[in-house]
Amino acid sequence: MNPMTTLARKMRERGHEVFFTGIPDCEPFVRGAGFEFRGFGARQFPAGFSEEWLARQSRLHGLEGLRATVEILVQGLEMTVREAPPVLYEARADALVWDEVGRGAFLVAAQLDVPLIQIANALPMHLYDSVPPPFSGWPYRPDAIGKIRNRIGYAAFGYFMRPALAAFSEHARRLGVPLDGKDRNHGLSKLACIAQLPSAFDFPNPELPSWFYHTGPFHDGLGRPHTDFVWDRLSGDPIIYASMGTVQNGFELVFRTIAEACSGLGCQLVMSLGSHVTQESAGPLAGNCVAVRYAPQLELLRRAALCITHAGMNTALESLAAGVPMVAIPITNDQPGVAARVAYTRTGVVVPYRRLNAVRLRRAVREVLNDSRYRENARRIAAAVQAANGLERAADIIEESLRLPRQRPQNG
């Protein structure tokens, strides 16, 4: 939600009227950010559903985690197509700006006959033979063998995703929305897709369409709630910051392994455990370690020498924006694809979840800490992100794509 409310603030600053729509669990965050909220889906996704789903998802990995994600995507698609149009029609929405994961928005926009712009907050789901499937974790390989490998991977991915694809196709048929049976990129707007993924952190992809834009992340330094932290417990040693994100963070063994791997390295480990692991359930943690449920991530990254991450897009981009190299432990969904880009750009080292142990992780941490090239590469991408000014560029693209009058920021 943070990137979307950041983008919404920028559009409102430029004089445009903005409101949010979504399931009830989105409402407190949206209203807390100062925006109007119009909800739908309360029967199928009542308040509290997200926390229950995240609690289940927090302990899943690999194909099991991906399967659970596909199931919720199908449910969300059907609910969105059914319940969003009346809400948006009543609100007299002129255009939709929607997270790319919610492919139901494509069919909603078709029903309402309004333009759709999609935002790729995670790894973009644009499936072309030039790059590996986002969930594969495969290295970039531009030759013919690599493209054949990718094509096979997409066929397997399509088989795995067939419940979501079947639901989308059925709703499109019912609504009279034509689909190209040969195009695996169903549900993508041909107007604009804006990716937070910077081009400097992506694989080269000559197949991307002209309406795809790498803007880089949306940051304005606003909108995040204050998070208390025990700053007086910092020892002055170099900081290793570790977070497994907000979804797959229910693995106590991972946190214990991270603590063991980082002990005795002359650094202080700061771990954000998240909502599904407590200090009690994590058990005794080795070394010079500060473990908290929630941490002020941006502030700690600015002080960190290294970030240990699940390779979620938001944490990876925030680490890079701070010029901090990573050790990535991808678990499921698009995290292997993000981790593959960490390896490709040499902004860090990848330790796959299935091969994780303290010895292997310690080796990776030492490599990144001792080889200055990782930090230099991270700083290079940080400079590219700063120069790109992703938030302003995204707002420009929205205005240009929708042919909106360019507004001046409203002061006061």
Where are these regions (language model features)?
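A donor-sugar binding/catalytic signature common to diverse glycosyltransferases
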Residues: T5-A8, L96, V292-A340
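Conserved nucleotide-sugar phosphate-binding/catalytic loop shared by glycosyltransferases and other
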Residues: F19-L66
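Conserved nucleotide-sugar donor-binding subdomain of glycosyltransferases
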Residues: W53-A105, K147, R151-N185, S189
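Conserved nucleotide-sugar donor-interacting segment of glycosyltransferase catalytic cores
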Residues: V74-K147, A200-F201
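C-terminal amphipathic helix plus adjacent low-complexity
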Residues: A91, A358-G412
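Active-site-proximal region of nucleotide-activated glycan assembly enzymes
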Residues: I117-F203, P209
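Donor-nucleotide binding loops and adjacent catalytic segments primarily
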Residues: L197-L306
